[in-house]
Amino acid sequence: MRAAVVVFPGSNCDRDLAVAFEQAGFDVSMVWHKDADLPQGIDIVGIPGGFSYGDYLRCGAIAAQSPICKAVVAHTARGGYALGVCNGFQVLTETGILPGALLRNAGLKYICKTVGLKVETSNSVFTEGYNAGDVIGIPIAHHDGNYYADDETLAALKAEDRIAFTYTDNPNGARDDIAGILSANRRVLGMMPHPERAADAGHGGTDGVALFRALAGALTPA
């Protein structure tokens, strides 16, 4: 299994995400934002948290125009898998790979703490290691994590069982408490919380491990 982790100027969770993939059994390649292509044979692309391009203009807006993001868009259009965490979720919405947008937190403050997440669906390669209804503890660290989508988009996300995670105690004003969503083909997950920061007992929690193990199990060649 092979994963590629994209690195932008201002990324600061790329190595954490790479380690979480590696611990689950993936061979990981770090891919620079100026690269025009992803490595051959990649099973999944990880877009990490951080402050790509300093969050200028809008979080993820400049990163979405980078050469590597054109390759990521093509990868997902072919049915490839992708995981966007925090700033990575913002990039996925800015590229149009996922619907909606991430707005400034309702309280207008940066939030860094562990929050409760409810698993809304186990019907994806990302969440099949959990049971629907499980409540897990995953850290957040963001200033612009307030998920917004119009009523039509929200209705579609609900009808198609594409809301992956919701907050048990909404920290940022996200519509319908949404913390993470899936693409229409269920092969792309964007989420504001950081599962890679809950993948080592020495760092305070392991509730994110099941996500990476589920990915490894699903993407391991038969």
Curated annotation (Swiss-Prot):
Q: Check the record and name the InterPro entries matching this protein.
A: Class_I_gatase-like (IPR029062), PRibForGlyAmidine_synth_PurQ (IPR010075)
**What EC number(s) does its UniProt record assign?**
6.3.5.3, 3.5.1.2
Reactions catalysed, semicolon-separated, are: N(2)-formyl-N(1)-(5-phospho-beta-D-ribosyl)glycinamide + L-glutamine + ATP + H2O = 2-formamido-N(1)-(5-O-phospho-beta-D-ribosyl)acetamidine + L-glutamate + ADP + phosphate + H(+); L-glutamine + H2O = L-glutamate + NH4(+)
Location of the active site: 86, 194, 196
Task: Give the UniProt keywords, A-Z.
Answer: ATP-binding, Cytoplasm, Glutamine amidotransferase, Hydrolase, Ligase, Nucleotide-binding, Purine biosynthesis
Q: Name one GO cellular component term.
A: cytoplasm
Question: Which chain regions cross the lipid bilayer?
Answer: none
Record domain Glutamine amidotransferase type-1: where:
3-222
Subcellular locations according to the entry: Cytoplasm
Query: Which processes are annotated in GO (biological process)?
Result: 'de novo' IMP biosynthetic process
- Quote the function comment for this protein: Part of the phosphoribosylformylglycinamidine synthase complex involved in the purines biosynthetic pathway. Catalyzes the ATP-dependent conversion of formylglycinamide ribonucleotide (FGAR) and glutamine to yield formylglycinamidine ribonucleotide (FGAM) and glutamate. The FGAM synthase complex is composed of three subunits. PurQ produces an ammonia molecule by converting glutamine to glutamate. PurL transfers the ammonia molecule to FGAR to form FGAM in an ATP-dependent manner.
Q: How does it assemble?
A: Part of the FGAM synthase complex composed of 1 PurL, 1 PurQ and 2 PurS subunits.
Protein's name according to its UniProt entry = Phosphoribosylformylglycinamidine synthase subunit PurQ
Origin species = Ruegeria pomeroyi (strain ATCC 700808 / DSM 15171 / DSS-3) (Silicibacter pomeroyi)
